[in-house]
Amino acid sequence: MRTNQKCLAVIVVLLVGLVLAYGAMDSALNRSKKELTSPIATAQNAIHIPGSTIEINQSFSTIDPASQWVVVSKQFPLANPAYRPADLHKVSVASRLDKPDDELSLRQKVEPSLTAMFAAANKQGYAIMMASGFRSYQQQQTYFDSYTAAYGREKAETFSAHPGQSEHQTGLALDIAYTDMNNCYLEICFGQTPAGIWLAAHAHDYGFILRYPANKTAVTQYQYEPWHFRYVGKPLAKALYESGFTLDEVKPYLEKH
């Protein structure tokens, strides 16, 4: 009888142990599942580039002209010369009034960030305006031809894009200047003005990048343009600012995602 009782006790202890072990294993598995599906832990929600990590809710194409990550350059021109953003509209921030409405327009998705950035700059005492926004293929052709006639083709190509190679045609890029056009208007010296310095340091807070930095001319194939800013969204803008890379340099990383 005692032997049977001892055996029964051993069996009960073993069963309890198995139940506890199973419970612990199940709890660990549940924790692992939560970790694997959380936005921070999922590799699909983070793009790692040297010097920074891009935490994202979604990725974007670097080829689609409607994508906020699209790369448009001498090496990667727009496939469709007639491309025109569907959500193009005239911006509400201060702009040059002697420009056509098209050139005073950007993509609608850019408007909230642009308005916030201009408001912050104005609060700092910087009276700035959008000097140029969207440009059609034909408008860019006019600009390029004019610069070529004035400076020669080789010089023009250092600061003006051939039609089809301009970010302005995406409706995501703009030139920013002081409202006082005598104050380094679209000139390299704008980068040393209070507004230029502030924009270079804070544009990423609003999803914009300084597209053609001074130390990256060999990469971008354009001269330093402290007035030219491009919208890419806050996550990517922050990563580019932290890493010091240009959009051209991180294109391969974005395409791997």
Identify the residue ranges that each predicted region occupies:
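Extracytoplasmic cell-surface/polysaccharide-interacting catalytic and binding patches
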Residues: R2-S132, Y137-H257
